[in-house]
């Protein structure tokens, strides 16, 4: 588990067993606390410090719940060896798909509120997943779907497994089985 969600499998990080260094590991930075701060202010006041941390790691993951589309160009320039990028509900998912192409893992943070009710709107869940997946397929994105931050399932634990079923169906519909 790395960053704000996801699995960090990679063949790009190599270390000597028993002598692992930061350069052999994933780094993670985010700025969700600055979601209402302008991209220019993030560039000036936050990214220089995040760059200093990120340069110590072999690969980097960036983002959590902040909308990334408005600050993407600055993040891309500041964070070395960036491989994974969080695309939250507060980002323009289409723009992020175009920006990331096949160069980064598109870590799509699905809204946990979709399954936080007793009876989820399955058609809405399906439609939203399909919109994102279709866009990502067109742009050649490497997509990861992340359902997290579930503090309640509307007293219906089946919501989680049903969401997985729907997600698998939509992935198969867009990408084939």
Predicted regions, residues:
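Active-site loop segments of alpha/beta catalytic cores
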Residues: 1-177
